[in-house]
């Protein structure tokens, strides 16, 4: 009786041991596959968390309307654009390739932190769903391609509000194409496939925010 109990317990334990392995593999094989996935010791742990969130919290699609506070930003779009034009020339640029080795060197791709813009900063502080840490204005000057990629963690969603754009810049997600048109916004899961293509010599400016699920 005891031996049979131990054997059955051992079988159950082995089955449970496979659960986290399957959760990691599920996260790993999502396109586009990151071939450096297992070079980061923390990534498999994030993979388990990502898979758990997909089971519990993830939706097929995300809508800005379900996060009412974000409407405040869109309503203030004209003033946010005006503030950007006034304040940004007085600030130093931070280039993406200096903050993350994933980005290719590109002097036309940089950002300004949201905290440097008083109106924007005050609005953000009124919206509880926003994670203020990474809030920024992202600027692209000239043609550019961001190849297919995805964030390491799906803990946060990604919100974008286009401040400047003439329709020459497109964001592609697993839900289709979003054209960066002035005053238009989008909310998506940036831990899933997305890429970007900009074809003209003009400037595109987007407000980027991380959103709590």
Model-based region annotation:
Residues 179-193:
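Conserved metal-binding segment of the jelly-roll/cupin
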Residues 161:
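Basic nucleic-acid-binding interfaces
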Residues 164-182:
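A short beta-strand-loop-beta hairpin characteristic of the jelly-roll/cupin
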């Amino acid at each position: 009786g005891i031996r049979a109990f131990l054997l059955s317990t051992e079988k159950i334990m082995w089955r449970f041991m496979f659960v986290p392995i399957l959760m990691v593999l599920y996260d790993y094989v999502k396109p586009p596959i990151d071939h450096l996935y297992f070079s980061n010791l923390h990534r498999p742990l994030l993979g388990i968390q990502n898979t758990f969130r997909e089971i519990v919290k993830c939706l097929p699609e995300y809508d800005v309307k379900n996060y009412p506070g974000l409407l405040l930003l869109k309503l203030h779009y004209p003033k946010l654009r005006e503030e950007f034009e006034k304040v940004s020339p007085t600030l130093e640029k931070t280039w993406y390739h200096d903050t993350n080795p994933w980005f290719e060197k590109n002097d036309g791709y940089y950002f300004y932190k949201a905290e440097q813009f008083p109106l924007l900063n005050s609005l953000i502080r009124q919206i509880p769903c926003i994670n203020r840490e990474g809030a920024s204005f992202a600027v692209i000057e000239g043609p550019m391609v961001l190849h297919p990629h995805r964030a390491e963690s799906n803990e946060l969603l990604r919100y974008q509000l286009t401040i400047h754009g003439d329709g020459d810049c497109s964001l592609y997600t697993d839900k289709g194409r979003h054209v960066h048109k002035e005053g238009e916004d989008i909310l998506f899961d940036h831990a899933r496939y997305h890429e970007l293509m900009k074809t003209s010599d003009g400037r595109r400016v987007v407000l980027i925010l991380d959103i709590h699920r």
